[in-house]
């Protein structure tokens, strides 16, 4: 369904990305999809394909510049070497601008794990984004200037999340409330990465990950309905 495209960052640099588009829907709303710490892999391409099937243009920036991994130690290395401010303010900002410049009047941002943290930062640093859906990931809260967030947000969080403890979600929620941000958070009786269908049984890349199909379906439905309200 999708293809590789190249777009420009605000600073003029180029970024490769995976683009999935609905058939015969010119000017459809769009979503920038941000990867987990594993990189731009088949699983995140599949998420973009699902958005396309739901009627959205979906663009996945290649934040690691062609690298991806199944090894947690290497993924941690790739993530810690990523400049999050640059990724949000340049790669993701450029993705939003590219989609708006190619026919989409409204563009949302969504991301998983590391991508959830980047979605939160994008709400601060990318004023052109029209809505955001955060999946079980947040940055250090001192980097969240909630007063700058204008886009409505939705968050899907796992109560038993080891990488991103729920106490941090409570603190983020309080910060957003204090700033008057329009948002809705949902907490699920699940572990980290409960939306990732590859994290099941012996296929799990880390023991703290666990796919939950029922909760994944519920969160997906909420996401599609939210973008339907905010992007259409």
Where in the sequence are the language-model features?
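N-terminal cap/leader regions of alpha/beta-hydrolase-fold enzymes
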Residues: 1-232
